[in-house]
Design a protein with these regions (language model features):
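Contiguous effector/interaction surfaces
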Residues: 92-99, 123-129
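Conserved helicase motor core of P-loop NTPases
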Residues: 1-94, 100-102
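Aromatic-residue detector
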Residues: 11, 15-19, 46, 68-69, ...
């Protein structure tokens, strides 16, 4: 949770700075890499540069509990302001959990609430009243992260053995990281997971060894 607070402090501080400067979130600018983007996209890029992944949904280190704890910790640091955790509050990240072709939002899409009643998906602004089923996205399951890559991936494994932990699941989590991987796990659980092979995966052992080094 502490690691999440420090990493998410970046995009939330950026958001507060833009508000203080009264930036139009849909206005475009040229970033330090010479790329044209909107201020909303810049905040989303900051949020998406790091992703926290966990193996389970329901446990002390599952996605549901960690999403709750991270939100409360960010509020304690005065980086977020909300009364109830399920409120729409500025800075809240969400992940769509069902397809809605009318709104053109699909399972796995990530958005940020950056203004009252409005969520941005890239440079697209959608009213909160039109958002389909969703959940907080401070933390997501390794399974849900398939197909995505992040500059920095933080992977959290449970403290007790669980049938869902497998070599393939670890492989999925490890390969989400483009440049940096952090793992929160005790050695016994890690070794148990990488030995639990569901199906053969060519080159997996070598990749895991390289990542550990």
């Amino acid at each position: 949770v502490k690691s999440a607070v420090e990493n998410y402090r970046v995009y939330l501080t950026q958001l507060q700075t833009y508000f203080a400067q009264k930036k139009d979130l849909n206005a475009k600018f040229i970033d330090e890499n010479g790329c044209e983007k909107t201020y909303a996209e810049a905040i989303l890029d900051s949020f998406n540069s790091v992703r926290f992944l966990t193996a389970l949904r329901a446990s002390a280190l599952g996605v549901e509990e960690l999403n709750r704890e991270i939100a409360l910790a960010l509020r304690a640091e005065k980086l977020l302001w909300f009364r109830q955790e399920d409120d729409w509050y500025i800075g809240k990240p969400i992940m769509i959990t069902e397809n809605d072709h009318n709104v053109k939002l699909y399972n796995g899409d990530i958005g940020l609430c950056l203004a009252k009643g409005k969520v941005w998906f890239g440079n697209r602004e959608v009213s909160t009243s039109r958002i389909p089923a969703h959940e907080p996205a401070f933390m997501m399951t390794i399974h849900k992260s398939q197909g995505s890559e992040f500059e920095h991936t933080v992977m959290v494994l449970p403290t007790e053995p669980n049938p869902v932990l497998s070599r393939e699941l670890v492989f999925t989590g490890v390969t989400r990281a483009k440049n940096q991987l952090s793992v929160f796990a005790n050695e016994k659980i890690w070794q148990s997971a990488v030995r639990n092979t569901v199906k053969r995966q060519s080159g997996l052992g070598k990749l895991l060894q390289e990542k550990e080094e």
